[in-house]
Amino acid sequence: MSTFSASDFNSERYSSSRPSYPSDFYKMIDEYHDGERKLLVDVGCGPGTATLQMAQELKPFEQIIGSDLSATMIKTAEVIKEGSPDTYKNVSFKISSSDDFKFLGADSVDKQKIDMITAVECAHWFDFEKFQRSAYANLRKDGTIAIWGYADPIFPDYPEFDDLMIEVPYGKQGLGPYWEQPGRSRLRNMLKDSHLDPELFHDIQVSYFCAEDVRDKVKLHQHTKKPLLIRKQVTLVEFADYVRTWSAYHQWKQDPKNKDKEDVADWFIKESLRRRPELSTNTKIEVVWNTFYKLGKRV
């Protein structure tokens, strides 16, 4: 994804403004995984959000490697790691594409040496078939592949903001034309058209969660599989900073025709306060995301 590789992309803001993942989700992955825990590779790791979380949340792996095609993202991940060297002593980062495991070395690449491969908030940019076949070539028998992501948040307590949550990212006068496709459409669809191949993986588990279900306790408890529930308390200013981490926002800012236009993220704050004047820019409100996950074990 070229935007995230741009030298002027703010990877520090990306790291600080994106949501993290709940402990109970990592516990579920721990319970799902069978066998050894020598090596975990987190592809498309970005600034190491999930990579570094897994180093703390999962039962220990001897080695964790985060890989990403963006040198900008990897640099940020390494800076964060260096801030807590003892905590992340088993973590390293490599510049590499999602389907390229050459960084393992000639004696290990395509030799079924990996115990777990994760792809977090990134698989919509991949050639999914190429990725899963490369994962198959590098995972040991019964090794875990875990793919998850999120998109299109809502403010559950403020349904009057729902149309804003469509207008800001997808409005034709705003960011809509600036998303790289088909990646964004795949993510909006929660990768429902990308399937783990049952000839390559078994014990496949898939879950989709609609953020609006948090408004309906009946629907929330009807999920047959435990959903990935990503929720966060944010101020309007913090949410605007999250908007600024979107690749479409970066592209919008780069377009000269938008030079004199009102900033989309600033407009979101202004419009939110107009609709709910009792709020301030520093009022904490809950945001919840649509999510999905796909788990499998190598045959």
UniProtKB/Swiss-Prot annotation:
* Major location category of this protein: cytoplasm
This entry's comment on induction and repression of expression is:
During amino acid starvation.
Keywords carried by this UniProt record: Acetylation, Cytoplasm, Methyltransferase, S-adenosyl-L-methionine, Transferase
InterPro entries, per database record: Diverse_substrate_MTase, Methyltranfer_dom, SAM-dependent_MTases_sf
Q: Where does the record place it?
A: Cytoplasm
One family from Pfam that matches here is Methyltransf_31
Instruction: Enumerate the catalysed reactions.
Output: trans-aconitate + S-adenosyl-L-methionine = (E)-2-(methoxycarbonylmethyl)but-2-enedioate + S-adenosyl-L-homocysteine
Source organism's superkingdom? Eukaryota
Give the E.C. number(s): 2.1.1.145
Q: What are the GO cellular component annotations?
A: cytosol
Which positions, given as ranges, span the membrane? none
Spell out the molecular function terms from Gene Ontology: trans-aconitate 3-methyltransferase activity
The kind of enzyme this is, by top-level EC class, is transferase
Under Gene3D superfamilies, the record lists: Vaccinia Virus protein VP39
What is its biological role? Catalyzes the S-adenosylmethionine monomethyl esterification of trans-aconitate and 3-isopropylmalate at high affinity and of other molecules like cis-aconitate, isocitrate, and citrate at lower velocities and affinities. The function of trans-aconitate methylation appears to be in reducing the toxicity of this spontaneous breakdown product of cis-aconitate.
Q: Which PANTHER family match?
A: METHYLTRANSF_11 DOMAIN-CONTAINING PROTEIN, METHYLTRANSFERASE TYPE 11 DOMAIN-CONTAINING PROTEIN
- Give the family from UniProt: Belongs to the methyltransferase superfamily. Tam family.
What protein does this entry describe? Answer: Trans-aconitate 3-methyltransferase
Taxonomic source organism: Saccharomyces cerevisiae (strain ATCC 204508 / S288c) (Baker's yeast)
